[in-house]
Amino acid sequence: AGNIIGTVALMPTKNKLVFELTKMAVKPEYRNKGIGKKLLKKCINYSKSNNHSSIILYSNKKLNNAIHLYRNFGFKEIKMEKKSPYLRANIKMVWIND
């Protein structure tokens, strides 16, 4: 008991109604057990209960499992800025609270 097996972080942006999913990871030996789903669901429920308008995230398209998970939770790909804030990011996604 008490072992950390995953992490997630939501960070406020300049727009107080928009949060960024800045970190989400699950230890390799605990993957494909629904932990990522639980972490992402917590973030979405937190955003809903605090009336946030949306969650944005940056990722890399080669992270197929992560992109698939985000899409399953309603995240949609949107246009990325010319200068990405993250060196390895090549996809930007948004979840809209409706």
What are these regions (language model features)?
Residues A1-K23, K27-E29, L40-K42, Y46, ...:
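Acetyl-CoA-dependent GNAT
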Residues K16, N50, Y58:
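Residue-level signal for short amphipathic helical patches enriched in basic/charged
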Residues V18, K33-G34, L87:
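Non-catalytic, surface-exposed connector residues within folded enzymatic/regulatory domains
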Residues K27-K33, K61-K62:
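Active-site acidic-Proline motif in GNAT/NAT acetyltransferases
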Residues K38-I55, L69:
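Conserved acyl-CoA
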Residues S53-D98:
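C-terminal "cap" of GNAT-fold acetyltransferases
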